[in-house]
C-alpha cells in the first residue's frame, strides 16, 4: 500500500501520485478474511484522509475518503456528489431505468422516497414484532437439537428474507431463487455473472408487475400500480427500478449483518456471556455491532470540480462512500477498532445506515430483526462457537458479509468444555 510510482497510466493526470494506493479495496478486504475490519481500521493510520485507488472490483478507479467528517459532507451535498448511475445493473443490460429512489437526486428523490416511507414506519415495524419472533423461534427449533448448524443457510438467509417477502407480499416459495440471485448479483467479482443475474431479476420483476396489473392484490407491487408521481401513474421503468431496489436491499443486508454479528459473538465468548447476563444490553450491542461491522459501500459521481482538504476532485470522478471507514474513524470513536457494548452510541452516531437524504428507509425493520435474533439465540441456545474443523469465509464485494459460518454448541449431557473447544478451533 505504498504510494504508487509516477506512471501516466492507468492513473488520471489530476490525481497526485502521493495520494494513489495501488490496490483494490474490496479484493484486499476479502483477502483479509476475518481480519478485514481490523485491516480497514489501520487505513486511518496508513493513508491520507482522501486517497485514490485504480480499481474496485470490476469498477473503475475512485476516490476513497476515510474520515467520517468528509463522508458526511459528501452525503449532505447531492448537488455536487450525485447518486445518478450509482449501480451498473441497467447499463449492463443495455437499459436506462434507475434504482429509485437510490439513484435519484433531490428534489426529484423526495417524490419516490415518499412512496416507500409508509411501509417502514416504527408503527408498521412494531406490528410485525410477534411475527418476527415466531419465525425466529421456528428456525431455532429446527437446529437447536443438532448441536451445530450452517448459520447462513439455517438462519441468516431465511429469517430476514421470509419477513421481507411477507411484508412485500411476494411468493415465499421463491425464496431460494431470490437468495441465489441477490447473493450472486451483489457479491460476485465476475461481470458476466452479475449481468446474468440482473437479467434474471428484471425478468421476474417484469413478469410479476404484469401479473399484478392483470390481477391486483394486497401487496407492494399492487400498491405501486395505484401510486402516482406528479399526478401521473408510475412508468414501467419506474416500477422496475423501485422493485429492483427493494429486491436487492431487502434480501441481503440483514443477512450480512447477522453473519458478521454472530461470528463476532462466536469468537468472543466473554461478550456473549455479557449479553446473556444482561439482556437489556442487547439493544446497545446491536448499535455497536452495526458500527463495528458496517457492510455497505456506495458511490457518488462528482458533478463539478470541488476541493476537499488538499484534494481536488474533477467533474466525472467517482467517490466511494465507505461506511466501514466512517465508523472506524478514531477522530469520532475512541478505540474505534474495539467492540464495546457499553459505548455511548448516541454520543457519536454511526453511519451504518448511511446519512442524509439517502439514509436507509428500512433501518427500523433491520434493527428490530437484529435485536430479536440476538435475544432469542442467546435465550434459547447454550454458548455457541465456531464449529470444529470449519473456517468462516468473508466477502467484501459490494455488501460485506460472511460467505460461510458454521456454529456449534454443546448439547445437554455433553461434558466437553465449550471454552476448550473454542481455544482448539481458534
Model-derived regions: residue spans:
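Cytochrome P450
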Residues: 1-426
